[in-house]
Curated annotation (Swiss-Prot):
Protein's name according to its UniProt entry: Protein S-acyltransferase 18
Region Disordered, annotated ranges: 443-468
Species assigned in the record: Arabidopsis thaliana
TM segment ranges: 17-37, 42-62, 203-223, 250-270
Positions with biased composition (Low complexity): 456-466
Free-text note regarding domains: The DHHC domain is required for palmitoyltransferase activity.
Protein encoded by which gene: PAT18
Catalysed reactions, as listed in the record: L-cysteinyl-[protein] + hexadecanoyl-CoA = S-hexadecanoyl-L-cysteinyl-[protein] + CoA
Any Pfam family the entry gives: DHHC
Coiled-coil ranges from the UniProt annotation: none
Amino acid sequence: MTRRRHGWQRPLHPLQIVGAVIYSVLVAAFYVFLGFFLGNRIAVIALLSVFSSVAVSVIVLFVRCTAIDPTDKTSAKKKRKDKSKGVLMKLRVKVVLSQVVVRFFRRLERKILRNFLRRTYLDPWKSSVQLEPLLPFPLVMKDDDSVTPDPKEEDDISYCSLCDLEVKRSSKHCRTCNRCVEGFDHHCRWLNNCVGKKNYTTFILLMVFVLLMLIIEGGTALAVFVRCFVDKKGMEMELKRRLYVEFPQWALATISIILVLFTAYGSAAMGQLFLFHVVLIRKGMRTYDYILAMKEENQFTEVDPFDELDSSSDESSDFDSPERLRPTFISKFMCRKANENQQRLSIKIEGDEQSPSSTLINKKPGFHVSINPWKLITLSSEKALQAAEKAKERLRKTKPVSGTEENSLKPLPLETKFGLLLDPDNNNTVLQPSTTAAVKLQVSPGRFSSPRRRFSGSSSSTVPSPKQKYRTNFDLKLTEVSRELESYISRQVLCSVIKQDGSEASPR
C-alpha cells in the first residue's frame, strides 16, 4: 500500500465527493431561492456579501486542509540537515579565517599605537567602547546544534516499525494513509486526510465557517418560508421578477422548509463536533487520547472504577486497533462510519495481530466510543491522559514479536559499516515460529544477509532435514546491548556452520 501525501491523492473517498456535492447544492439553493427574496434591498446586499465571503472561506479552507501533508518528516529533516552541514561548515570556515586575520591586524595596530603614540583612549580598560572578543562570532553562536545540541529534541524522537523511520513521540501511524502523522488527532473521511499538528488549526477554522454558513442559510430559509405566508402578493411579484417564470409559492415554501430542516440538522451536528474539539483543546487532549481513555475505562469497568485508575491492573490488552468512533445520532453528519458493520478505527499504531483479551473486548456487546462533548466535559483531563498513557504502554507491551516487527528491525551498527546486509530480492528464506531452516541462497557464498534472520546452506537440498534445524531463542525485545550480544552469538554460529568453500556443515 502506497503512502498518501494529501487528501486529493486518488482514490478519493466517497464522503469527500458527497461533501463537495452538498456544498454546491447549498450554495446554489441560497443564490437561486433564498438570497434575493427577503424583501429588503439593504438586507439582501448585506446578506449576500456575508454569505459569499463565508462560502469562499469554506471552500478555501476545505481545499487547504485536504491538501496539507501532515506527515511526520523528522527523518527527512535530519537527512537534509546532515547533507547541508558539510556545505555550511565549509562556508563558515572561510568566514572564521577571514575574521581571524582581520582581528589580528587590528590588535597589532592597537598595540603599536599604544606603545608609540600613548593614546589613553585606545586602552580597552579606559575606553567606553567595548572591543570585540577574541573568539570569532560564528564559533559562539547559541543556535548552532553542533555547539549546543538540544537534548529535548533527541528525547522526543521515537521509532515507527511500520514506516521504518524515526518520528516524534506525538506521531501516530494511520493505517488508511499508511504514514505517521505528527500530532495525530484523527482521520477525517470527509477530508480524506488525517488531521494532525500541521492542519489542525485549518480544520478548526473550517468547522467554524461551515457552522456559520449553515446558520446563515438556515435563518434565511426560515425567513423566506415565513414571508411566503405573510406577504403572498409581494412574494409572487418578486418571483416573476427574479426567476422570469411563474414559480408557485408552495414550491418555494417546500424548498425553504427542507433547507431549514437540513441546515438545522447539520448545524447541530457541526456544533456538537466543534464543542467536542473546543473541550479537547481546553483539556489539552486529542481525539486519539480520548478514544484510548474511553477504551481503558470500558476495559476496567468491572474491575476498578474510572476514578481509581491509579490502582488498575496491567492486564495484557491490545490497543493496536481501536474501534471506529461510533457517533451519536446528531454527530453522524461529520466523520461518521462508512460501514456500520466494521468496528475498527482506520488507524493502526503497530502490528496486525490482536490478543485474545482485546478480541473479547471488541466483541463485547454495546462497546463503542462516541463523540460526546458532555461526557468529555465531566471527564478529568489528568485521569483521561493517564488512562491514555496506560493504554499506550499496554500497546507497547503486547505488540507482536514476529512478522512485521522482525522484518522491520533496523540494521546493527556493524552491518551498516561493513555492508553485511544483502538485497532482499535475492533472499529465499523459510521462517518458522520456533525453528529456522538452513536454505541455500542464490548468491555467492561470500556475502550473506543479516545473521539474525537467515543462514546459507547447500544448493543440493531445498527442503531442510531435521538435523539442519536449530532452536532460535533470541528475544527481539531486548535492549541495545542484548541486541549486540545476539548479533555476536549469531555470527559465531554462522562461522561454525559455513565452511570456506560455501558447503554446509552441521551446527555444533
